[in-house]
Protein backbone atom coordinates (compact mmCIF):
# COMPACT_ATOMS: atom_id res chain seq x y z
CA UNK A 1 0.00 0.00 0.00
CA UNK A 2 1.03 3.55 -0.65
CA UNK A 3 -0.53 6.75 0.65
CA UNK A 4 -0.37 10.38 -0.43
CA UNK A 5 -2.25 12.98 1.57
CA UNK A 6 -2.51 16.75 1.68
CA UNK A 7 -4.59 19.10 3.78
CA UNK A 8 -5.75 22.70 3.65
CA UNK A 9 -7.87 24.21 6.41
CA UNK A 10 -10.68 21.81 7.27
CA UNK A 11 -10.31 19.70 4.12
CA UNK A 12 -8.05 16.88 3.02
CA UNK A 13 -7.29 14.75 -0.01
CA UNK A 14 -6.05 11.20 0.60
CA UNK A 15 -4.93 8.91 -2.23
CA UNK A 16 -4.37 5.23 -1.39
CA UNK A 17 -2.78 2.72 -3.75
CA UNK A 18 -3.11 -1.05 -3.40
CA UNK A 19 -0.36 -2.74 -5.40
CA UNK A 20 -0.03 -6.42 -6.21
CA UNK A 21 3.63 -7.45 -6.01
CA UNK A 22 2.85 -11.18 -5.87
CA UNK A 23 3.02 -13.68 -8.74
CA UNK A 24 -0.73 -14.17 -9.08
CA UNK A 25 -3.82 -11.96 -9.30
CA UNK A 26 -5.62 -10.89 -6.13
CA UNK A 27 -9.41 -11.17 -6.31
CA UNK A 28 -12.30 -9.73 -4.30
CA UNK A 29 -10.14 -6.78 -3.28
CA UNK A 30 -12.22 -4.42 -1.15
CA UNK A 31 -11.59 -1.38 1.05
CA UNK A 32 -14.26 -0.91 3.72
CA UNK A 33 -14.15 2.42 5.55
CA UNK A 34 -16.08 2.91 8.78
CA UNK A 35 -18.52 5.81 8.79
CA UNK A 36 -17.81 8.49 11.41
CA UNK A 37 -19.85 11.52 12.43
CA UNK A 38 -16.92 13.94 12.62
CA UNK A 39 -15.83 13.60 8.98
CA UNK A 40 -17.67 14.17 5.73
CA UNK A 41 -16.14 11.74 3.26
CA UNK A 42 -16.48 11.42 -0.51
CA UNK A 43 -15.06 8.13 -1.82
CA UNK A 44 -14.11 7.14 -5.36
CA UNK A 45 -11.98 4.24 -6.48
CA UNK A 46 -11.28 1.42 -8.89
CA UNK A 47 -14.56 -0.23 -9.90
CA UNK A 48 -15.56 -2.78 -7.26
CA UNK A 49 -13.03 -1.65 -4.64
CA UNK A 50 -15.72 0.01 -2.50
CA UNK A 51 -18.26 -2.84 -2.74
CA UNK A 52 -20.07 -3.64 0.51
CA UNK A 53 -20.87 -7.18 -0.64
CA UNK A 54 -18.36 -9.76 0.63
CA UNK A 55 -18.57 -11.46 -2.76
CA UNK A 56 -17.83 -8.22 -4.60
CA UNK A 57 -14.57 -6.36 -4.98
CA UNK A 58 -12.14 -5.89 -7.82
CA UNK A 59 -9.30 -7.94 -9.25
CA UNK A 60 -5.77 -6.58 -9.07
CA UNK A 61 -3.55 -8.21 -11.66
CA UNK A 62 0.16 -8.84 -11.10
CA UNK A 63 2.15 -5.60 -10.91
CA UNK A 64 -0.92 -3.40 -11.16
CA UNK A 65 -2.77 -1.23 -8.65
CA UNK A 66 -6.22 -0.46 -7.36
CA UNK A 67 -6.73 3.14 -6.33
CA UNK A 68 -8.87 4.87 -3.74
CA UNK A 69 -9.41 8.62 -3.42
CA UNK A 70 -10.92 10.21 -0.32
CA UNK A 71 -12.01 13.83 -0.11
CA UNK A 72 -12.67 14.68 3.53
CA UNK A 73 -13.91 17.65 5.52
CA UNK A 74 -13.93 17.94 9.31
CA UNK A 75 -17.37 18.43 10.84
CA UNK A 76 -16.38 18.28 14.54
CA UNK A 77 -13.36 17.70 16.83
CA UNK A 78 -12.15 14.09 17.07
CA UNK A 79 -9.36 12.12 18.71
CA UNK A 80 -9.20 8.86 16.76
CA UNK A 81 -8.16 8.04 13.19
CA UNK A 82 -10.90 6.45 11.03
CA UNK A 83 -10.75 2.69 10.60
CA UNK A 84 -10.45 0.84 7.29
CA UNK A 85 -10.49 -2.86 6.49
CA UNK A 86 -8.67 -4.21 3.44
CA UNK A 87 -9.91 -7.59 2.23
CA UNK A 88 -8.78 -9.80 -0.65
CA UNK A 89 -8.59 -13.41 -1.77
CA UNK A 90 -5.41 -15.16 -2.89
CA UNK A 91 -5.20 -18.11 -5.31
CA UNK A 92 -6.58 -21.19 -3.59
CA UNK A 93 -9.45 -19.27 -2.04
CA UNK A 94 -7.74 -18.03 1.13
CA UNK A 95 -9.38 -14.83 2.38
CA UNK A 96 -7.25 -12.14 4.01
CA UNK A 97 -8.53 -9.22 6.06
CA UNK A 98 -6.40 -6.45 7.58
CA UNK A 99 -7.72 -3.79 9.96
CA UNK A 100 -5.94 -0.47 9.43
CA UNK A 101 -6.18 3.17 10.46
CA UNK A 102 -6.30 5.95 7.91
CA UNK A 103 -3.63 8.67 8.34
CA UNK A 104 -6.28 11.25 9.22
CA UNK A 105 -5.64 12.77 12.64
CA UNK A 106 -6.74 16.05 14.20
CA UNK A 107 -3.36 17.73 13.75
CA UNK A 108 -3.74 17.41 9.96
CA UNK A 109 -6.30 20.22 10.19
CA UNK A 110 -4.30 22.65 12.32
CA UNK A 111 -3.31 26.14 11.25
CA UNK A 112 -0.24 27.54 13.08
CA UNK A 113 -0.64 30.65 15.23
CA UNK A 114 2.26 32.71 16.61
CA UNK A 115 1.64 34.47 19.91
CA UNK A 116 3.75 36.84 21.97
CA UNK A 117 4.74 35.42 25.39
CA UNK A 118 2.25 37.55 27.31
CA UNK A 119 -0.63 36.61 25.01
CA UNK A 120 0.29 32.92 25.15
CA UNK A 121 0.43 32.81 28.95
CA UNK A 122 -2.84 34.74 29.22
CA UNK A 123 -4.61 32.20 27.00
CA UNK A 124 -2.88 29.32 28.76
CA UNK A 125 -4.22 30.40 32.14
CA UNK A 126 -7.69 31.06 30.73
CA UNK A 127 -7.94 27.41 29.58
CA UNK A 128 -7.40 25.85 33.00
CA UNK A 129 -9.86 23.19 34.16
CA UNK A 130 -13.21 22.11 32.70
CA UNK A 131 -11.67 19.09 30.94
CA UNK A 132 -9.73 21.42 28.68
CA UNK A 133 -6.32 20.10 29.73
CA UNK A 134 -4.61 16.80 28.94
CA UNK A 135 -1.20 15.92 30.35
CA UNK A 136 1.10 12.92 30.22
CA UNK A 137 4.74 12.17 30.97
CA UNK A 138 6.74 10.01 28.59
CA UNK A 139 10.19 8.49 29.05
CA UNK A 140 12.64 8.48 26.16
CA UNK A 141 13.46 5.01 24.73
CA UNK A 142 16.36 3.14 26.40
CA UNK A 143 18.55 3.54 23.30
CA UNK A 144 17.77 7.26 22.87
CA UNK A 145 20.60 9.81 23.18
CA UNK A 146 20.66 12.19 26.16
CA UNK A 147 18.29 15.13 25.99
CA UNK A 148 20.44 18.03 24.82
CA UNK A 149 20.18 21.03 22.49
CA UNK A 150 20.17 18.82 19.39
CA UNK A 151 17.41 16.66 20.86
CA UNK A 152 15.35 19.77 21.61
CA UNK A 153 15.71 20.88 17.99
CA UNK A 154 13.91 17.68 17.03
CA UNK A 155 11.18 18.47 19.56
CA UNK A 156 10.76 21.94 18.05
CA UNK A 157 10.41 20.32 14.62
CA UNK A 158 7.77 17.93 15.97
CA UNK A 159 5.74 20.83 17.38
CA UNK A 160 6.02 23.09 14.33
CA UNK A 161 6.06 20.62 11.42
CA UNK A 162 4.46 17.51 12.89
CA UNK A 163 1.70 19.02 15.01
CA UNK A 164 1.47 22.14 12.79
CA UNK A 165 1.71 24.57 15.71
CA UNK A 166 3.30 27.99 15.61
CA UNK A 167 6.20 28.19 18.06
CA UNK A 168 5.72 30.79 20.79
CA UNK A 169 9.21 31.76 21.93
CA UNK A 170 10.07 33.65 25.08
CA UNK A 171 7.39 32.01 27.24
CA UNK A 172 10.02 30.35 29.45
CA UNK A 173 13.49 31.16 30.71
CA UNK A 174 14.53 27.51 30.36
CA UNK A 175 15.66 26.05 27.00
CA UNK A 176 13.95 22.77 27.90
CA UNK A 177 10.39 23.90 27.15
CA UNK A 178 8.71 24.32 23.76
CA UNK A 179 5.38 26.16 23.60
CA UNK A 180 3.08 26.40 20.60
CA UNK A 181 -0.32 27.61 19.43
CA UNK A 182 -2.63 26.58 16.61
CA UNK A 183 -6.22 26.62 15.42
CA UNK A 184 -8.15 23.43 14.62
CA UNK A 185 -10.25 24.13 11.52
CA UNK A 186 -13.66 22.60 10.87
CA UNK A 187 -16.19 22.96 8.09
CA UNK A 188 -19.10 23.24 10.54
CA UNK A 189 -20.96 26.55 10.72
CA UNK A 190 -22.21 28.55 13.68
CA UNK A 191 -25.55 30.40 13.75
CA UNK A 192 -23.99 33.33 11.90
CA UNK A 193 -22.63 31.12 9.12
CA UNK A 194 -19.00 31.32 10.24
CA UNK A 195 -16.79 28.25 10.40
CA UNK A 196 -16.39 26.80 13.90
CA UNK A 197 -12.72 26.61 14.90
CA UNK A 198 -10.95 25.55 18.10
CA UNK A 199 -7.98 27.34 19.63
CA UNK A 200 -5.23 24.95 20.80
CA UNK A 201 -2.10 25.36 22.95
CA UNK A 202 0.69 22.90 23.74
CA UNK A 203 3.74 22.82 26.00
CA UNK A 204 6.45 20.15 25.84
CA UNK A 205 8.72 20.25 28.89
CA UNK A 206 11.92 18.22 28.95
CA UNK A 207 13.56 16.74 32.03
CA UNK A 208 17.11 15.92 30.87
CA UNK A 209 18.08 14.42 34.24
CA UNK A 210 15.35 11.78 34.12
CA UNK A 211 15.21 11.40 30.32
CA UNK A 212 11.55 12.35 30.14
CA UNK A 213 9.10 14.80 28.59
CA UNK A 214 5.86 16.17 29.95
CA UNK A 215 3.30 17.02 27.29
CA UNK A 216 0.46 19.35 28.27
CA UNK A 217 -2.30 20.46 25.93
CA UNK A 218 -5.04 22.98 26.57
CA UNK A 219 -7.80 23.68 24.08
CA UNK A 220 -11.41 24.82 23.98
CA UNK A 221 -12.57 21.23 23.33
CA UNK A 222 -11.63 18.08 25.32
CA UNK A 223 -11.25 15.93 22.20
CA UNK A 224 -8.79 18.40 20.66
CA UNK A 225 -6.73 18.38 23.87
CA UNK A 226 -6.60 14.59 23.84
CA UNK A 227 -5.87 14.36 20.12
CA UNK A 228 -2.93 16.79 20.17
CA UNK A 229 -1.45 15.10 23.23
CA UNK A 230 -1.68 11.63 21.66
CA UNK A 231 -0.05 12.69 18.38
CA UNK A 232 2.70 14.51 20.30
CA UNK A 233 3.45 11.44 22.42
CA UNK A 234 3.75 9.15 19.40
CA UNK A 235 5.99 11.66 17.61
CA UNK A 236 8.29 12.10 20.61
CA UNK A 237 8.66 8.32 20.94
CA UNK A 238 9.93 8.26 17.36
CA UNK A 239 12.15 11.35 17.68
Model feature map: region roles:
Residues 1-239:
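A structural signal for beta-rich interaction modules in eukaryotic proteins
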